[in-house]
Amino acid sequence: MVYHDLIIIGGGASGLMAAIVAKDFGMDVAIIEGNDRIAKKILATGNGRCNITNDTISFPFDTFHSENSNFFLETLNSFTIEDTKSLFLSLGLPLMKLEDGRMYPRSLQSSSVIDIFRMALEDKQIPLYPNCKVTSVDKKKNFTLYTNNTDYEKFSCNKLILSCGGKAASKTGSDGSGYKLSRSLGHNIIEPLPGIVQLKLDYPYLKALSGIKFDGSVTILINDSVVRTERGEILFTDYGISGPAIMQLSYYASKALYNNSKVTIRVDMFPNESKEDLENFFTTHFSMFNYRDISSSLIGVINKKLIPIILKDAGIKDIHLPCGNIDWKYINRLLDKFKKWDFNCIGTNGFPNAQVTVGGVDTSEVNNITLESKLVKDLYFCGEILDVHGDCGGFNLQWAWSSGYIAGKSASN
């Protein structure tokens, strides 16, 4: 049996942070990692550049979400963006700010972040046990951990941090096994759901729309009530819809679909213009080219591949009819589609394609100041395993750094 004062299960972002902090506080700490190397999920973040944090994060932290909306406030206040920048600089990794406050390593390489952590573990002599999947945990006086590695079948520790992640991006090793360990120690799990993920639509012309992208705004409606609107690039696919604006809204869709609610995705192709603006423009436009068919008249105004589809949706069956011969009520329907093109959302693209997990360990059972379990003494949590997630844009990694720091510090006291 291998003994350490503190063992961290999971060598992802939050677990690595917790280990470094605990070691700096003088703890005998080790990391057990199920993969063959640390932080595989970091490689995929920020399109391979690693969006480490976001410079816009501030109280009341409305880009973070949990069933317990106050849980994360203390943690994010205690280890801030400035603390994150300082800590990475101390490890040898300067950061730079790009669009929308997103911060990256100056190298713009995710691999740099992993290399910096790997060197930090070596410098601080923090043992790492890779290819070691923890299958069960017992708690008596100390914690006893059992693994599937024949060389290291059994571990013991006085204090334990669970930083096993969630279920998102499952190809990186995130299989939800931390939930099983948490349940075995008495904790409840808020149903894990895919977040920051593409959405599936029920629409007959998806194959024709596939590959079309444009800048616009997207609104999600739950049971016909508006919940949130986002602007950005919108991409249609053969299964539904994607793009940054969609990814931001997907959290609401996941939860609503799980609760069997009606989910509508409303696309506004002209977010900078009002319906009246469009009426004025098209009145002039169609008058100038009243001899042209309606289909040709829309070329240059919207994506050419969209024209026959949106005309059908507006009830204009003959797309070769001259503009001057079309009843204005049909033109009005077309303008309505430009501003409010509604789609029925029937699902998400699942955990393999999700960037974050919605749900996790019930935070009502965790101390919001120390991140120690309220049920099991000397058990701590950090990162995505908890029922906390953020919007797309570096917010989830900031939660990893902040919660990892607090868990590592608290476990060292």
Segments (PLM) and residue ranges:
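A conserved short coil-to-beta-strand element within the FAD-binding core of flavoproteins
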Residues: 130-142
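An anion/pyrophosphate-binding glycine-rich loop and adjacent beta-alpha core
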Residues: 36-38, 43-44, 52-59, 188-191, ...
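Beta1/beta-strand and adjacent pyrophosphate-binding region of the FAD-binding site
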Residues: 1-14, 30
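Glycine-rich active-site loop/strand segments that organize a redox cofactor
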Residues: 49-97
